[in-house]
Swiss-Prot record:
Subunit relationships: Part of the 50S ribosomal subunit. Forms a cluster with proteins L14 and L24e.
Cited SUPFAM superfamilies: Translation proteins
GN (gene name): rpl3
Classification of source organism: Archaea, Thermoproteota, Thermoprotei, Desulfurococcales, Desulfurococcaceae
Residue ranges the record marks as coiled coil: none
InterPro entries from the UniProt entry: L3_arc_euk, Ribosomal_L3_dom_3_arc_sf, Ribosomal_uL3, Ribosomal_uL3_arc, Ribosomal_uL3_CS, Transl_B-barrel_sf
Annotated protein name in UniProt: Large ribosomal subunit protein uL3
PROSITE patterns, A to Z: RIBOSOMAL_L3 (PS00474)
Source organism (scientific name): Aeropyrum pernix (strain ATCC 700893 / DSM 11879 / JCM 9820 / NBRC 100138 / K1)
Keyword RNA-binding recorded: yes
Length: 344
């Protein structure tokens, strides 16, 4: 009679523990890449997930068996209406206390933005006075950030009016004075996704995944299901032993919340940026979303989240070597599927 092997591979990753619900629907960007392109540029943008389709394009990645040939690529459409730059914030750095805010300057938002739905205490501002106060502290500044508000009313698939706020780092150069001058120029104005990204660029996608509620260990951790025979009369979709409650290790797989987690997916390529949403809207519209009516971004592959969910796109923080050598190249798309997604 054969003996069971003494070790099995660990099921599931402890790197994502605790597996709890995300604290906020619009994720906060925790890390920013160091970008040097010779001019200031915002390093992130917010959009709303519309849905998926597929395209045919010429594979321009070097060293691939399909290089130079037409390939099938699944894509995700993210609708990205222009964002209003509501405020500029400066951060200083202290070795003992870390990063701290030096102050901020707010611009008066237009009435159609309805920013008071998000910030109920919003009042009137003396923007020039606040900017002058920031300039006096510019010698202590390490980071320049923009507080930008989305315009969900311009998105075709959304019915909400409350804008979402996102803090965006301004990068591209190391001179803080140039970064601050750029922030002053865009304060109170709109920025488009074309001002942040370009076609062919790699971005990181940060979003909250689709929620699945309370699930067992098989679905939540991927543990192996036990054989269904008489010696496993207590169940098969469970772990073999957990011990009693007081001495259970935290690494032990247990049932609980699954999904609705904040996740980051790296190096998603932008295949297209366009203002005509009908180029990518399938017949009958995207399921649970509708028609794309404003500027959109087409990303290769899948991304986290459900339709209508806020998606944060950030400059790639760890791009591959081939991308660093060849740079940004515009993809050659030969076909976009507009077939209906009903019943798929």
């Amino acid at each position: 009679m054969g003996a069971r092997k003494k070790r099995a591979p660990r099921r599931g990753s402890l790197g994502f523990s605790p597996r709890k619900r995300a604290s906020r629907l619009v994720p906060r960007v925790k890390r920013w890449p160091e970008v040097d392109i010779g001019k200031p540029v915002p390093l992130a943008f917010l959009g709303y997930r519309a849905g998926m389709t597929h395209v045919f394009m010429v594979d321009d990645r070097p060293g691939r068996p399909t290089s130079g040939k037409e390939i099938f690529v699944p894509v995700t459409i993210v609708e990205t209406p222009p964002m209003f730059v509501a405020a500029v914030r400066l951060y200083g750095y202290d070795p003992n206390r870390g990063r701290y805010s030096l102050g901020e300057a707010w611009a008066q938002p237009p009435p159609e933005l309805e920013l008071q739905r998000r910030i109920s205490t919003l009042g009137s501002f003396d923007t020039d006075k606040m900017l002058k106060s920031l300039e006096e502290r510019l010698d202590k500044a390490e980071d320049v950030r923009l507080i930008a508000a989305s315009q969900p009313k311009l998105a075709g698939g959304l019915s909400k009016k409350k804008p979402d706020l996102l803090e965006i780092k301004v990068g591209g150069v190391s001179d803080v004075t140039k970064l601050f001058d750029y922030a002053k120029d865009v304060l109170g104005n709109l920025i488009a996704v074309n001002d942040v990204f370009e076609e062919g660029q790699l971005v990181d996608v940060i979003a909250v995944t689709k929620g699945k509620g309370f699930q067992g260990v098989i679905k939540r951790w991927g543990v192996k299901e036990l054989p269904r025979w008489h010696k496993h009369r207590k169940g098969s979709r469970r772990i073999g032993a957990r011990s009693h409650g007081r001495s259970t290790f935290w690494e032990t797989p247990q049932a609980g919340q699954t999904g609705f987690h904040r996740r980051t997916e790296y190096n998603k390529r932008i295949l297209m940026i366009d203002d005509d949403g009908y180029k990518v809207t399938p017949a009958g519209g995207f399921l649970r979303y509708g028609v794309v009516r404003s500027t959109f971004v087409m990303l290769s592959g899948s991304i986290p989240g459900t339709p209508k969910r806020p998606i944060v796109m950030r400059w790639a923080i760890r791009p591959p070597e081939w991308y660093l050598k060849l740079g940004v190249r515009k993809p050659e798309i030969t076909y976009i599927s507009l077939a209906s997604k009903q019943g798929v």
